[in-house]
Structure formats: C-alpha cells, structure tokens
C-alpha cells in the first residue's frame, strides 16, 4: 500500500458512522453585496484597478485601434506583439496597414523556442483580449489560448488588454456559474488586477519583477 492510499484509507475510516452536514449555502448572502447595475460596473472596476496602478481608458469598438496607436507613440514603444489570427489582431493589422508610420508589429505565430531571446529581451509591449472582468474585485479574466498563449501577457513589460464593457460581471460566483466551471475547471484561467509587483523585507515596492510593469486596459463601451 502506498503512502497516499494509506492516508486516504485512514481518512475514510475516520468518517465511518458520521453524518454529513447539510449544505446551507446562501447564494444571496454571497452575491447581494457584490451586485451592481450596468452603470455601476465600469466605475467599480476602474476604482479598484486604478488603486493598484492599472491604467484605464474608455473607448469604442471603432476607435480603440487609433487609441492604442496613440498610447504606443506616447510611451515611445518601438513595437507591439499581437496574435495575428484573433479578431483584434486582424483589426490591428488592418489599421497599421493604413498607417505605415506606426510602431512595428510582431506576430506570435511560431514556437517560443524559435525566438525566445527576442521575446524576452526585445519585445516591449503586447496586446491581448480578455474573457471579461469582475467588478467586485477589480479583476480581468485572462484566458490564454493556442493563438494567444500566457507568455503574451506575462513577458512584455507593457501589457495592453482589451475588455468589452458588456463582459464585465458582478462577482466571481456569477463567472463560475456562467461558464459552468463546476462541470470542468479551466486549465489556465487567470484573474489579474494590476501590474506585477513585489516587495522586499524592507517593504520597498517594485513593479515588473514577475510580469509586466504596466497594465493598460482599453474598455470598449459596447453596450
């Protein structure tokens, strides 16, 4: 018998003859304090995210490529990493084609091993989509895919994230229910509230130690 089997056996034996406690979970108790109207969600999300140094911009489905281009110029960023086969990647490619003076585009379209040095040392910014956000906690929901892997939102020092206003949920319970995570947990979903930060024993706060030093969220007011 393995150590694992031995431990589980002891746990099962200890439960013999016991009666499970009824589950008195109260949905309203968990969700009512963290439920918002459509008009409240963006201000609530913005307040919490800006408190941890996230930069928020309100824009539109038509205007966000031009806004992104201006933000890149303002920060003097020489290039932007995109996922070219995503809808937002295609929008950026089209906008850039009509404005050849913009910073260079880099495509995440090959295995990381083929351009690891460039990705880690010469890729200053990236753009990804999001699955939505949670107003109650001020968090983006990132959902890495084969087209848009986790390294895109982790490695470049500046991460631009697109968020549709209609996809801002009230609370984490609503997200779990809507996506039916109880039936099968996602392999790599992330909740991100701000840029990477850490502090040493002297409580000196530093940004960018374990991820982007800047998080810039473009909220598309599509509702």
Task: Identify the function of each model-found stretch.
Residues 1-223:
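The feature marks the mature, well-folded catalytic cores of soluble enzymes
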């Amino acid at each position: 018998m393995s150590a694992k089997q031995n431990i589980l056996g002891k746990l099962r034996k200890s439960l013999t003859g016991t009666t499970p406690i009824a589950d008195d979970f109260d949905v309203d108790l968990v969700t009512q304090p963290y439920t918002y109207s459509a008009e409240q969600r963006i201000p609530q999300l913005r307040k919490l995210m800006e408190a941890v140094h996230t930069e928020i911009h309100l824009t539109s489905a038509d205007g966000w490529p031009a806004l992104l281009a201006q933000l890149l110029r303002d920060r003097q960023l020489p290039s932007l990493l995109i996922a070219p086969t995503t809808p937002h990647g295609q929008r950026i490619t089209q906008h850039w084609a009509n404005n050849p003076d913009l910073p260079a585009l880099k495509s995440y379209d090959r295995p990381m091993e083929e351009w690891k040095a460039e990705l880690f040392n010469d890729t200053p910014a990236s753009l990804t989509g999001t699955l939505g956000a949670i107003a109650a906690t001020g968090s983006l929901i990132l959902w890495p895919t084969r087209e848009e892997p986790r390294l895109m939102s982790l490695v470049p020092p500046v991460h631009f994230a697109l968020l549709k206003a209609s996809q801002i949920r009230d609370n984490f319970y609503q997200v779990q229910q809507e996506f039916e995570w109880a039936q099968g947990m996602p392999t790599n979903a992330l909740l991100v509230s701000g840029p990477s930060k850490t502090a040493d024993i002297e409580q000196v706060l530093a940004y960018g130690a374990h991820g982007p030093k800047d998080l810039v969220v473009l909220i598309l007011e599509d509702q």
